[in-house]
């Protein structure tokens, strides 16, 4: 699991940037709408909607905005359909990149994603070209200060895959994709309140980057993240701490 913390440093950098851009609201409005469309408007019986609801509230989205997004999903007409589409490719330095999107116009989204890859020295690939380098997992994160021993015991009892303590004292619990909601609920019932919980694509191998390549890869990730239809971007880039410090 050593690669997870390296992957996380890119993720946390992106989260700070997303918050500044205000894109996080758009992201969770779409997720609320799609989750409600697929599983109904009751978070009690729709785990995906419940997760999106928690995320939206955590981003300080108003209840009114949340309710409108859910209502739009439940009552959406065929003409309002939003598709979930994934794109795969390679960035500078041979870094594998996965892009998750939600779109009402697949041609527009495909063109925009392809343009980003091309402009930043990467190549958009075909389905399956890099997906085999990633595993879909659940990640449940806890802030520093949580009782580590008790959390590990509870996580193992809930059939979590692994528990990783990060340098800053925060703890990540990793689960299988299918077991994510069960583990999350079990930890919550045991009294552990997560700081974050989500389904992620974790790389099974990593590409260690120098400063020059890291700058190029992060430029591509930034450009992809800036696209309106993009929800998540994952890569197998591993940026050493000393390089990340130089990047700021």
UniProtKB/Swiss-Prot annotation:
Which Gene Ontology biological process is one annotated for this entry? regulation of DNA-templated transcription
- Select a single GO molecular function from the record's annotations and give it: DNA binding
Q: Does the keyword ATP-binding apply?
A: no
Keyword Transport annotated = no
Where does it sit, as one GO cellular component term?
Answer: cytosol
Quote the subcellular location field of this record: Cytoplasm
Query: What keywords are assigned to this protein?
Result: Cytoplasm, DNA-binding, Transcription, Transcription regulation
Q: Which Pfam families match?
A: TACO1_YebC_N, Transcrip_reg
Could you tell me the superkingdom of the organism this chain comes from?
Answer: Bacteria
Tell me the InterPro entries matching this sequence. Integrase-like_N (IPR017856), TACO1_YebC-like_2nd/3rd_dom (IPR048300), TACO1_YebC_N (IPR049083), Transcrip_reg_TACO1-like (IPR002876), Transcrip_reg_TACO1-like_dom3 (IPR026564), YebC-like (IPR029072)
Family note: Belongs to the TACO1 family.
Please give the PANTHER family that the UniProt record associates with this protein. Answer: TRANSCRIPTIONAL REGULATORY PROTEIN YEBC-RELATED (PTHR12532:SF6), TRANSLATIONAL ACTIVATOR OF CYTOCHROME C OXIDASE 1 (PTHR12532)
Q: What is the name attached to this protein's record?
A: Probable transcriptional regulatory protein Psyr_1407
Organism of origin is: Pseudomonas syringae pv. syringae (strain B728a)
């Amino acid at each position: 699991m050593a690669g997870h913390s390296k992957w996380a440093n890119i993720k946390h950098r992106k989260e700070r940037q997303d918050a500044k851009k205000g894109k996080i609201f758009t992201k969770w409005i779409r997720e609320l709408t799609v989750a409600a469309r697929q599983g109904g408007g009751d978070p009690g019986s729709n785990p995906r909607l419940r997760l999106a609801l928690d995320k939206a509230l955590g981003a300080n989205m108003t209840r009114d905005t949340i309710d409108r997004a859910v209502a739009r999903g439940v009552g959406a007409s065929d003409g309002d359909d939003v598709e979930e589409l994934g794109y795969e490719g390679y960035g500078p330095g041979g870094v594998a990149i996965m892009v998750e999107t939600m779109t009402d116009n697949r041609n527009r989204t495909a063109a925009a994603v392809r343009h980003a890859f091309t402009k930043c020295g990467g190549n958009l690939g075909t389905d399956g070209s890099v997906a085999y380098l990633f595993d879909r997992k659940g990640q449940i994160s806890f802030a520093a200060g949580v009782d580590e021993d008790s959390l590990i015991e509870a996580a193992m009892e809930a059939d979590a895959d692994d528990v990783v303590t990060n340098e800053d004292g925060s703890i990540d619990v990793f689960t299988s994709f299918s077991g994510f909601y069960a583990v999350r609920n079990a930890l919550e019932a045991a009294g552990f309140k997560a700081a974050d919980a989500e389904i992620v694509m974790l790389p099974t191998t990593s590409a260690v980057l120098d400063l020059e390549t890291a700058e190029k890869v992060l430029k591509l990730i930034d450009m992809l993240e800036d696209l309106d239809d993009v929800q998540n971007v994952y890569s197998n880039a591993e940026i050493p701490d000393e390089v990340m410090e130089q990047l700021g």
